[in-house]
């Protein structure tokens, strides 16, 4: 699947644990246009074709440009840098490690197309 050239480093793929389901999640480290992290949900449609949709966006955190490395000064923000995702064994929760922010996020993915 091609998420688009701005989505760099799709590091983690996590399929549903339920063997009757044909969906999962992919964590993307950074969007080069705005420093957001992203999670895409992927699934097989009725015709057997694999599809994907961005379902979670994690915004960068604003920061003083003087505190940032040169590469990030123009953005004025710290990117979340999604480095790992894990799906709970009951397929209910997705855990997302945001290394750049030093945070772990939890999303309810009971409805994989509409995480909360």
Where are these regions (language model features)?
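Short loop/turn segments immediately following the C-termini of beta-strands
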Residues: 27-31, 99
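Residue-level recognition of a conserved intra-blade site in WD40 beta-propeller repeats
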Residues: 13-17, 87
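Short coil/turn segments that connect the beta-strands within blades of beta-propeller domains
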Residues: 20-22, 90-92
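Structural signal for beta-propeller blades
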Residues: 32-39, 102-104
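Short loop/turn segments immediately following beta-strands, especially the blade-tip
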Residues: 40-60, 106-116
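Structural signature of WD-repeat beta-propeller blades
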Residues: 9-11, 83
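Hydrophobic beta-strand segments that make up the repeating blades of beta-propeller
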Residues: 24-26, 94-96
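Surface-exposed loop and turn segments in beta-propeller and other repeat-based domains
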Residues: 1-6, 51-77
